[in-house]
């Protein structure tokens, strides 16, 4: 047990019970955002397709314990929570890899101001754990050069307009033939679509998207 866990015992992000960052009961309560055997059709509520984005799926429904855990990861200065969350999502991530083949994992970037405020980029933390668990490479190829307004009140078209020009390739970055862009929450897929557009413009031929949870 780590010293920090002795001095400050962790509590479950889902139910608040002390002993772990995410207890077994809450992890077991995570509801899949798609059928166990993922069928990659547009009618599937867990699957999204777009102009630049070939395909995107989410592991879980954004509800109950999943919502609490992702909100704590994003706003509660709990970087360690990325590990159990990403590990829980590995089966869904592996199902996407069966379709995508060998790819580079690319996290959705946050603006430098937001990164300083939180101390980390939650999408990058999740992407590293997913990539390590699946045995595929990860690289922060994208940067967020422009801060954007809050998007929760915008529809998909509004979000795409809001994100126009927000993402760029990092200096010297060379996109691979295929990539998976990773984010924490999938709502309209506008963020994944915007990132995919930059990667495609940079030479990437196929871009997939993966999120821990989807609002349904």
Model regions: which residues?
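Glycine-rich phosphate/pyrophosphate-handling loop used in enzymes and phosphotransfer proteins
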Residues: 1-216
